[in-house]
């Protein structure tokens, strides 16, 4: 095992052992993302900061490599979804995002070296400056809320069972539901109405028209890995 691999293993052992705005007709429209503001439901106040940021700019930069990281740091986005990294490098990725004055939310399920267990959320909380997590697992979201982090439940709408998962999120009470793919305005509207929770969406959205359709259907914000969407 090389030096990097040894360092990663040591990090894991040390931790585990002890326990918006949208352009419309050439004009920028503040608050166009969502009709009405959300108010925090207790906790650290991070939730309200996220909602306020997405009211100002409803486009979220989703990054999946270092090239995306470099581009998002220069983009006029206030919120970043981190979709890559490992236990050795995630703190550095988050640090750069935070130093740029942006909100950093890590997709905990995608970080190499982390399991989909509650202790992985503790790891991110204790070793990085991440504001919150995304996960498809209810136990991960629940732990994030216990640690006063932002918790976003991601749901892939591939069948009726997935839709039931989205509807049941009202009992889990995440800060938002992130549904993919994003080209389903009817589902966005329905999930928001039934759960009463903020809805984020993304995936396959590449044009301004698609962004506007999702926002008009009631989405709070749109996430995208495409830098051209970040500039809309």
Which residues fall in each region the model found?
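Glycine-rich phosphate-binding active-site loops on the catalytic face of alpha/beta enzymes
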Residues: 82, 184, 204-210, 217-232
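Catalytic cores of alpha/beta
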Residues: 119-124, 169, 188, 206-220
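Conserved, mostly hydrophobic/aromatic
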Residues: 72, 137, 214
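Active-site-adjacent beta->alpha loops and helix N-cap segments on the catalytic face
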Residues: 84-97, 113-118, 135-149, 158-164, ...
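Short, acidic/polar
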Residues: 63-73, 117-121, 160-168, 207-210
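Hydrophobic faces of well-ordered beta-strands that scaffold small-molecule active sites
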Residues: 59-61, 80-82, 104-108, 133-134, ...
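Conserved N-terminal beta1-alpha1 strand-loop-helix module at the mouth
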Residues: 34, 39, 43-108, 112-114, ...
């Amino acid at each position: 095992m090389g030096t990097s691999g040894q360092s990663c293993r040591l990090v894991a052992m040390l931790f585990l052992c002890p326990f918006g705005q949208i352009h419309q007709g050439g004009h920028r429209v503040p608050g166009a993302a969502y009709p009405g503001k959300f108010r925090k439901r207790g906790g650290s106040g991070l939730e309200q900061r996220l909602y306020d940021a997405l009211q100002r700019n409803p486009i979220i930069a989703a990054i999946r490599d270092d090239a995306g990281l470099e581009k998002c740091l220069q983009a006029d986005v206030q919120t970043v979804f981190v979709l890559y990294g490992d236990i050795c490098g995630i703190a550095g990725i988050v640090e750069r995002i935070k130093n740029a004055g942006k909100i950093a939310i890590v997709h905990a399920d995608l970080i190499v070296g982390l399991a989909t267990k509650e202790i992985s959320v503790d790891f991110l909380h204790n070793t990085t400056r991440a504001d919150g997590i995304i996960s498809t697992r209810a136990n991960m979201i629940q732990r994030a809320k216990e640690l006063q982090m932002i918790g976003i439940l991601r749901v892939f709408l591939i069948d009726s069972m997935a839709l039931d998962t989205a509807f049941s999120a009202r009992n889990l009470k995440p800060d938002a539901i992130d549904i993919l793919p994003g080209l389903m305005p009817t589902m966005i509207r329905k999930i928001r109405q039934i759960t009463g929770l903020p809805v984020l969406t993304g995936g396959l959205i590449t044009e301004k028209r698609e962004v506007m359709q999702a926002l008009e259907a009631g989405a709070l914000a749109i996430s995208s890995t495409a830098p051209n969407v970040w500039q809309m």
